[in-house]
Amino acid sequence: MRLPTLSQIHDAQAVVYRSMTPTPQYSWPLINKRLTAGSRLGVEAWIKHENHTAAGAFKLRGALVYAEWLRKAHPDRKGVVAATRGNHGQGVGMAAQLLGLKAVIVVPHGNSAEKNRAMCAQGVELVEHGQDFQESLEYARRLAHERGLHLVESFHERLVMGTATYALELLAGVPPLDVVYVPIGMGSSVCGMAAARNALGLKTEIVGVVSAECPAYALSFRRRELVEAPALSRIADGLACRTPNLEALEIIWQNVGRVIEVSEAEIAEAMRAYFEDTHNAAEGAGAAALAAALKEKDSLRGKRAGIVLTGGNVDREMFAAVLSGSLQPLGKE
């Protein structure tokens, strides 16, 4: 797959902006300053607030671009199906509703109740199947065949075009960044960042971030081959990938400087930092990039960093437990 060009990203922006406005990027003083030993970053950081979209996450952008392409390329299709842990499904549901399409969304058993409720509010048919995202995806493929629905995969060139629109907003809207941290679920976000950076001719290092409990992309990056791994995250379901997408991996291998792992405890601390310092709610996957920057803050001295807050769709009980410190993350003794 070829990354979208600057012209293609601009075309995607025209589609996206019919349904939403650009999201802000802010440099928050309390995130930036090292007020006391061990606190926050101590560097100039710019937070891209994709938690401010109408769906609460960046996934809406790709879904809008994909739906526009589907309307033109397959006008006979009357419905779509997708597998998700939440944000992809919300984006697909909202885009389908705008175009008058039926949407069937498959989620694993035990999925976030609040994300399920948000998807149902978009008028989707919600189906629970499987124990993780991969099993839900396999069932969604089966439903697509049985019911004549169009399958919206979690990685596709049109989704990358959509995510590249937020990356272009960030990179074109702030002073040149030395490094930008991007969470990796299935890969559309980090690939969109690579597309925007390349289109603008920048030298910004892109750092992908995964949960240590969902290391498939990190392992695949290091070994330069597709590696499956358990996806066990309790706090960052948006990063729960067991089987990486090979097209995404090929782009990551060529365009991303590093892929690092952050612990569940580090993600929880980043969620607390966002709320305490900016009064923004970040879901676990959305806070992973800040967790990575905090982990590497000593090596960031003298640099300007970008941090993508990919989403804020966190359940109330989970968020309350994180803020109170009562949640026992996986991987923590």
Predicted segment positions?
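PLP-dependent amino-acid enzyme catalytic core
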Residues: M1-E333
